[in-house]
Amino acid sequence: MSAKNVEHKFIVPNSVEVRDYQVNLASQAKNENCLIILPTGLGKTVVALHVIADYLTKGNGGVLFLAPTKVLVNQHYEFLKNTLAIDDIALITGEDLLEKRKKLWINSIICATPEITRNDIARKIVDINQFNLIIFDEAHRAVGDYAYVAIAEQLSGLSIRMLGMTATLPSEKEK
């Protein structure tokens, strides 16, 4: 018996297998802010893909996918480039010069590091309101003065969906 693949107009055919728990988690994350806690390797990024595809279907573009390291940001970017049936996806890190970043921020889907995002929001290079969905990978890092905290604080009161993903939660001591 072969595995069933996700069928969606914004997901490349035969690129992602259907897993009921991912579909169920994504269904909830489409309708409310969520923190998804799943062990490494169980497909948190695939859950995010389902949510992103839903936002694209509804015309609710403007997706910001944040990850704490350039390596993770690049992994998410490559995954989305290979699984989403659109070309309007950009990768932004601190290695990109200011003028290049200004042009990259206009894409529908942005994969970026939180520090450059926080700094470019402060510089008014990017407007947080251009996003309808912000995904925080490794969300357990959102403590203290980490850039995730500053970004999330700016979302307070705005109708921007937030999706946090992590394999671990911080202990009380870390908080």
Feature annotation, model-predicted:
Residues 1-175:
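N-terminal helicase ATP-binding lobe
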